[in-house]
Amino acid sequence: FLNQVDTKIEQLTKKEKLLQQYKKGVMQKIFNQEIRFVSDDGSEFCEWEEKNGNEIFETISNKNHNSDLPILAISQEFGAIPRDMIDYKITVTEKSVSSYKVVSIGDFIISLRSFQGGIEYSSYKGICSPAYIILRPFIEINNDFFRLYFKMDRYIQQLNSKLEGIRDGKMISYKYFSEIKLPFPCIEEQTKIANFLSSIDTKIEQTQKQLEKTKEFKKALLQQMFV
């Protein structure tokens, strides 16, 4: 029976890896425009535009808060997330919190590690360290489209090319961000792309949960065997 559980773990691990590879491959084809989506009536969408970062996003530095908003941790794994939702042990003084910036749902955040892991997205309202650069769209966009694009290898490489010759840990400035061209399909195609890629993410998450449950089941089984 233990062999069957091991086989299930192997299968789920392989499935997750294949889904990740599929997502990566299909994203490359979508953003190279080898794959194009069509509108609901079957007609073709207009050609993609290219816009500089500052034609879509402005930088926000709102420190007008009374410090009762949750402090957000900015991580490559979770994006912007309240610190108390993850194991984040750094403490801050009330005085330092007063200088923190307000982050709204739908904001994007450039961190010290964006040259490694891209730009993070916030699904939460909170406050973050003034060291971070907060980006907010001032024209209509699909947030998920850019959330996914900003984590792509090709975009991270573009961020890196802007930092050539600058030491590790250098913050990407709004000026650097603004100089990079961003793909800009019409909003309807942005939404189609985001929905399609999000559906793959859902399958990946479901597989990861199944894998975790199966591993926990095996662990419990082994504990019972050796009691």
Each language-model region and where it sits:
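Short, surface-exposed loop/turn microsegments at beta-strand edges and helix-strand junctions
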Residues: 64-76, 101-102, 119-130, 137-141
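A short glycine-rich beta-alpha junction/loop motif
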Residues: 112-113, 127-133, 166-188
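DNA target-recognition patches
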Residues: 57-94
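Amphipathic alpha-helical coiled-coil/heptad-repeat segments
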Residues: 1-47, 183-227
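Short, charged beta-turn/beta-strand-edge "cap" motif at the junction between a beta-strand
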Residues: 114-118
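Non-catalytic DNA-recognition/assembly elements of restriction-modification systems
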Residues: 39-64
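Residue "hotspots" at secondary-structure boundaries inside conserved domains
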Residues: 95-101
